[in-house]
Each structure stands twice: as C-alpha cells, then as structure tokens.
Amino acid sequence: MKSRISNPEIDKLILLISKLPGFGPKSASRAALHLIKNKEQLMVPLAESLLSSIENIVTCEICGNIDVNSPCMICTNEGRSKYQICVVENIADLWALEKSEVFNGLYHVLGGNLSAINSIGPDDLNLKKLIDRIEGEKIDEVILALSATVDGQTTAHYVADTLSKHSVEVSRLGHGVPVGGELDYMDEGTIAAALSARQKI
C-alpha cells in the first residue's frame, strides 16, 4: 500500500539516490531529507556541480580516465614515465593507485573484468586501445593492477596471454593484495607494497 506521506518529487529523489553505490532505501531517504533540509547549503550547490560535471567532464581518449580535458592531465604530464602502463579495472582503482604516490607512469582503464556470469567478454573491455598503445608507443612494461578476485585474475591471465605476442614485459601486483581483494578498498600502504613487489608473468 502506498504511504500517505508519499510525494512523487520526493520519491523520485529517493529512488535516484538509492541507485548510488552504498545506498539502500533507508539511507537514500535520510540523504534526501538531509538535502531538502539544507537546500541552499547543499542541494543547490550539488545540483550546480552535477550540471557542471555533465557539461565539462569527459573520458580520456587515450587511457579511459576522466578529466575536463582529453587527453587527460596524466597522459599529457611530461614528468611521468612514458615507458610503463598500469592496467586497472576502473577509474576508482586508478585513483587508489594515484593516492599511493608510488607509480609515476601511465594508466589504462579496462572498464571492467571478464565475467561469464555477467556476459562480459574481451570485446566488452577497452583492450584494443591497450594493444594499439603498446604497438604505437615505446612501452617497456605493462603492470596488471587488477583485483585479486576470480574475475580479476581471469582477466589478468587473458591480458597477459594477449600481450605475450608483443615485446613488452608484463607484471602483476605482488604480496599485499589479499585473495578476493579490490584495489579501491585498500589503504595506500598496502597498494604501495603490492606495486613494489610486483612479479613478472
């Protein structure tokens, strides 16, 4: 039965918030009420920021990162090593590695992992651009910084096998990443240790 305090506008706001990661119906309701209660201090600036993001944030044509420019600030930074590419599942993992401040090369965002359950195959990932970069740029090493989940490791093996046809060293994160672990949930120290202890494949 529909609640007597139900309102279409509020219901829509709660529904949209509930679609964000980490939000369920109750937490979405609390967030919606907090926004409404603090309309001028929070809701209006948030709406303006969202509109600005829609207009200005783009996906980097080279690595798949997001920025206000394409190519992004990482790809165009002359101070970074152009000989290493760190392959990550998603942008959150890229950010986690950047926070660790131990990697000074380039990145490549796959946009997911291979997954039979979710019907995600090689053609669904950003693999062709990775191969194009290796063939077109002077890349010495590709570091596979993928999650230690079943799908993550399956993807790592597939990418390593694909890259074995090219003259590039392929390595993966070493100790420090627990089985089933995902990068964006790990602290900077753990990520730094895993990157420093990377192993050749």
Label every PLM stretch briefly.
Residues 11-15, 29-33, 44, 48, ...:
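Solvent-exposed alpha-helical segments within well-ordered globular domains of core cellular machineries
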